[in-house]
Amino acid sequence: MNISGVFIPYDEEQPIKVIDIPRGEYTAIQAIIGGVFGVINIGRPTPSSIFIHDEGKIVGLPLNRRATMLLWASDSRWWHQDVIMGDAFILGPPDDEGDTTGIPEDFKQLLLDTEEYKMEVQTTGSGDAWAGNQLRFNDPFDALNYVLGLAERWHAVEQVRIVPA
């Protein structure tokens, strides 16, 4: 059985794309990432796992700005604390047996099949409420870049996300 993931190359001139791999074939992930991989589990926008080159920083792989923005948007504790170097591959969270699953359909659609995006923030004292504005973006990474820049300038921002407009 195959599972689907979203490949995010470090080279921003290259598009992100869906890649299907056989479930449980970790050598397929190694081939995509280019070596031994590490996994970062994220909870937002939906529980997922980002597979990265485990030695990307040590061997001097290039910064993956798009994957880093997704990581930072998943939880503000990552902001300016870490970056992803080299290619990244997003799959679903592990199942009850610890096996990797395919990327959740809503996350795949958000990255690849959404025509227009808006950004939202949670601010100090807003509880679970999200607030946005009228800005719209055609690219998810343009939206992420904008909202993360906003969070840098506006210190009341505690969390960020992008959603379909």
Question: What function would you assign to each model-found segment?
Answer:
Residues M1-I16:
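Short, extreme N-terminal segment that most often corresponds to the first beta-strand
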Residues I29-V36, R136-R161:
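A short, charged, amphipathic alpha-helix used as a generic interaction element across diverse proteins
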Residues G38-P47, Q81-F89, K118-G125, R153-A165:
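Short glycine-rich, low-complexity/disordered patches
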Residues R44-A73:
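Short, structured protein-protein interaction patches enriched in aromatics and acidic/basic residues
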